[in-house]
Amino acid sequence: MDSEVQRDGRILDLIDDAWREDKLPYEDVAIPLSELPEPEQDNGGTTESVKEQEMKWTDLALQGLHENVPPAGN
């Protein structure tokens, strides 16, 4: 039936306790420099990566909002 789970027993033979407990050494994990936070954080300790900081939208265009305000009254 379609509503019953069908398990493939062949996969169970591939995964054993040694495989489950195996971990990649921390030194072998390659992280691109653009994904790392800045090494010298003099501005309050932000944890954003360089890529996240570049993607941040900091221009709020408040001047444009001020210039486009319709005059008050009828």
Curated annotation (Swiss-Prot):
Annotated spans, Disordered: 33-56
Any idea where this protein resides? Nucleus
Question: Is this entry keyworded Cell cycle?
Answer: yes
Q: What does the similarity note say?
A: Belongs to the APC13 family.
Q: What cystine pairs are annotated?
A: none
Question: Which InterPro entries is this protein grouped with?
Answer: Apc13 (IPR008401)
Metabolic or biological pathway, per its Swiss-Prot or TrEMBL entry: Protein modification; protein ubiquitination
Q: GO CC annotations?
A: anaphase-promoting complex
**Subunit and interaction comment:** The mammalian APC/C is composed at least of 14 distinct subunits ANAPC1, ANAPC2, CDC27/APC3, ANAPC4, ANAPC5, CDC16/APC6, ANAPC7, CDC23/APC8, ANAPC10, ANAPC11, CDC26/APC12, ANAPC13, ANAPC15 and ANAPC16 that assemble into a complex of at least 19 chains with a combined molecular mass of around 1.2 MDa; APC/C interacts with FZR1 and FBXO5.
Family annotation (Pfam families):
Apc13p (PF05839)
What is the protein's name according to its record? Answer: Anaphase-promoting complex subunit 13
Q: Which GO terms describe its biological process?
A: anaphase-promoting complex-dependent catabolic process; cell division; protein branched polyubiquitination; protein K11-linked ubiquitination; protein K48-linked ubiquitination
Organism lineage reads as:
Eukaryota, Metazoa, Chordata, Craniata, Vertebrata
Keywords from the named record: Cell cycle, Cell division, Mitosis, Nucleus, Ubl conjugation pathway
- Report the main location listed first in the record: nucleus
Function noted in UniProt: Component of the anaphase promoting complex/cyclosome (APC/C), a cell cycle-regulated E3 ubiquitin ligase that controls progression through mitosis and the G1 phase of the cell cycle. The APC/C complex acts by mediating ubiquitination and subsequent degradation of target proteins: it mainly mediates the formation of 'Lys-11'-linked polyubiquitin chains and, to a lower extent, the formation of 'Lys-48'- and 'Lys-63'-linked polyubiquitin chains. The APC/C complex catalyzes assembly of branched 'Lys-11'-/'Lys-48'-linked branched ubiquitin chains on target proteins.
